[in-house]
Amino acid sequence: MALRPARCYRTTERRSYTRKEYVRAVPQPKVVHYVMGNSSVEFPVEVQLVSKSDILIRHNALESSRIAGNKYIMGECGRTGYLFNIRVYPHEILRENKMAAGAGADRISDGMRLSFGKAVGTAAKVKKGQEIITIGVNPERFYAAKEALRRCSMKLPTACKIVVTKGKELIKD
């Protein structure tokens, strides 16, 4: 069955559902790496992607955002010239009550009886003002990090802002 649109899951009004021991099978998050680049160096400039609203971000959106941003920053800075860090983890379990459609579906489907649903994915619960992604670079690569975060934000279902949290005085305009 096809993947439902993100609008079905993006609100945070529902109560958190994270208890894996009650769920028969939770799908693994698609996010492969949370820290990329050179983690042994302390970079003088740190730029963060910050959420502007409360939202659930699905694991496949986080993964596509990671790929887009990491690909760009690696091309600009090389393998050891940056530190890329995803700051959220998809703990929330997303459920779907699959409904049969078409001829004879009423005989097969249970409708809303036992409508709890099966786990179809995971999502990260992000609050307004929370950091989603952090990139550490040298001052001369600041604009590359900013562009990488802009590309990351295009893949996420919320409006984001880019904030310099460390080394603002080192950046030359």
UniProtKB/Swiss-Prot annotation:
The keyword Cell membrane does not apply. GO terms for biological process: translation. SUPFAM superfamilies: Ribosomal protein L16p/L10e. It comes from the Archaea. One of its GO terms (cellular component) is ribosome. Transmembrane segments: none annotated. It holds the Pfam family Ribosomal_L16. GO terms for molecular function: structural constituent of ribosome. The keyword Metal-binding does not apply. Keywords: Ribonucleoprotein, Ribosomal protein. Belongs to the universal ribosomal protein uL16 family. HAMAP family: Ribosomal_uL16_arch. This is Large ribosomal subunit protein uL16.
